[in-house]
Amino acid sequence: MTEPTRPAVRVLGRGRMGSALADALDGAGWNVDLVPGRGAHVAAAARDVSLVMLCVPDGAVAEVAAKVSASPPGASATEPGAVIAHTAGALTLGVLAPHARRAGLHPLVSVPAGPGGAASLRGAWMALAGDPLIDSVAQALQGRTFRVADERRAAYHAAAAISANHLVALMGQAERVAASADVPAEAMLNLAAGALDQVRER
């Protein structure tokens, strides 16, 4: 009995997100090719794969997407073409406009560097958009998913920023005030964790 063909994905960008996503998908049985996000090779990134994940800085997504050839050398004219996807929380699918098949996957998690990156993606909440193939990526990562339409992207990203960035800034302020009264920062963190648990249980 022949083994089923493993889905093929090319990940552009070797930063935290790209490395973590590549490791996680490789562990889930995907055929993964992790390459730098810039260089002459980008033009042929869609060749021989069903999915190209752009894991580059938000400001570079449109530029890199435009450099990926929709019909790379060697591709059959009858092939539907690879899905081009990004992992940016703030960007719509419009930045991938040169391509007919587009998608987005934004994990709602802080991805650490190193071996822990892949583990952080497994089971994480993920915002999906576009081509249904992206659902297969989320399923491979055992992600908990929801879909966000382009017209609601700004509101989604604002909510994510409030939940993460604003909370970090607020706790930093609380720690500084606590320090002025010789109160351990751990006490404030424990208090905040309890408050968040109550919010979760509402």
Predicted regions and their residues:
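Internal alpha-helical scaffold of NAD(P)-dependent oxidoreductase catalytic cores
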Residues: 21, 28, 116-201
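Hydrophobic anchor at the start of a short beta-strand
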Residues: 9, 32-33, 102, 145, ...
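Phosphate-coordination loops involved in phosphoryl transfer and adenosine-cofactor binding
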Residues: 5-8, 81, 123
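Hydrophobic Val/Ile/Leu positions in short beta-strands of Rossmann-like dinucleotide-binding domains
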Residues: 9-11, 54, 128
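Structural signal for conserved beta-strand scaffold positions within catalytic alpha/beta enzyme cores
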Residues: 34, 86, 104, 127-128, ...
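A generic structural signal for alpha->beta connector loops
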Residues: 29-32, 81, 99-101, 142
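NAD(P)+-binding Rossmann beta1-loop-alpha1 motif at the extreme N-terminus of oxidoreductases
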Residues: 1-48
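Rossmann-like NAD(P)(H) cofactor-binding subdomain of soluble oxidoreductases
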Residues: 19, 23, 39-117
